[in-house]
Amino acid sequence: MSYRFWRWMLPVAVIVLASGMLDTSAPAQGTPPYWPTEGWRVSTPEEQGMDSARLVAMFDAVEKADYALHSVLIVRHGYLVTEAYRYPYDQATPHDVRSCTKSVISALIGIAIQQGHVAGVDQRVLDFFPERAVANLDDAKRSITVENLLTMSSGFDWPGGILEPILGEWTRSDNWVQFVLDRPLADPPGTRFVYNTGGSHLLSAILQETTGVTALEFAQQNLFGPLGISPGRWESDPQGINVGGAWLRLTPRDMAKFGYLYLNGGQWDGQQVVPADWVATSTHEHIRAGGQWLSDGYGYQWWIDQAGYYMALGYGGQYIVVVPDRDLVVVFTSGLPTQDFFAPETLLNTFILPAVQSSAPLSPNPAAVADLEAGIRTFAHREASAVPPLPETARRVSGQVYAFDPNDEGWESLRLDFADEADTAQVTLDGIPLTVGLDRVFRLNDTPRPLIGYWDDPVAARGAWKSDAVFAVDAQPVGVPESYTLTLAFDSAEVRIRLRENVTGRGDSLKASLRG
């Protein structure tokens, strides 16, 4: 079991549940009872050998810690035993899975090898790009293989470790593939793990070079189609190559399908979608990832935990966890700040795995199931609370227009409108109105252009007066990990605004003054 489990363990839960962590259960044998191509069948946890009471404790812990989870799905023996969404998310909302995209790219490379598009993992990367003039070229760079890309051991100088501060420079470049190929080497290929989303992007470029279609098109034909997965968008680089290491959107149910495919050795309803030997090889440790925040092993774009499960992991807390010896798939989508990134794995080890009691059904426990349903409702955060009376400042600033000083966000004007006894307010930025819930419930807003951050998704917003002169707005672009808090501090003729992005904690300070 990895050190990070112990580091991030919930202390009270350890004491209460430590004995349950020793439980083991054999997976279900034989052919799955059905295939969820058209949709998941649901079941109580007890019907699939799991203890609802432990899952109730998990949701209690999530609420107490206030983890910024967007969804939690648990599949046992092929049945969806737990499905929870935090509003405004639901089962139909595609979520940016960030670096879970890497595991999808890995599957597509395996399929491409099986179909003969790629000769094998030993094929040299530069062979796919013969027309490119590559900087810093030497024999070591010429020796980089597809396997080196798959195992994050290409040797490219890619500073910053798992958080990859180089990504900004990379994505601002005119040609993302060329940027990676031109990087000097810091290590001989195959010798050291260095997390590198650019290397994963080269895998997508290789797919497009060899198949003649984009990774998304290849996936729709060979992976998503057979599983009944309907992907959201998949961002592309300036040359139209789907980003190999991030920015694919899937619903949590479709994320679970992908995990279930791997749980079943790449086989789906009689079709070998991903070669079985590729699944086995991909989810086997090829290199240690020590010293780069994550301490366990790495396969072919999959994280391998010493406890016996493997994971696709994405920025902000996107998880697809496959636990073969429990016949279990677990999915989390999130907007977790960096310090809480491992919270889903803590929840897995503290509550979900101990909930697996048997490979056979347990005795019914309707009271615990009812408590679990109540916990899922609480998790949704859709219950409105009473709206406190407005402070005098709200009446004073309502309807006033403020002009921003020059700022990096490009904002020019701000207006707020409040009404006594209303459960919403309106915040208008640069002429775009946002309805903001004042009763702790988010309100959804379509925006004609990116307004907060660089996402063009609908924005969910809620707000509250923190004091007589300070109003805070939580803004969540729906479908991405990032969320934002705007803290507005008013005085007689101006407002000072602190804008904070909640995953990284980075922020900006702005000032706006009343228009004369």
What function would you assign to each model-found segment?
Residues D51, V56, G78, H95-V121, ...:
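Active-site SXXK
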Residues G199-I206, G244-Q267, Q318-G335:
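Active-site-proximal alpha-helical segments within enzyme catalytic domains
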Residues P231, V279-V330:
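Active-site Gly/Thr loop motif
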Residues G314-S385:
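Structured C-terminal helix/loop/strand segments within mature extracytoplasmic catalytic/sensor domains
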Residues N365-G516:
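Peripheral terminal and inter-domain segments
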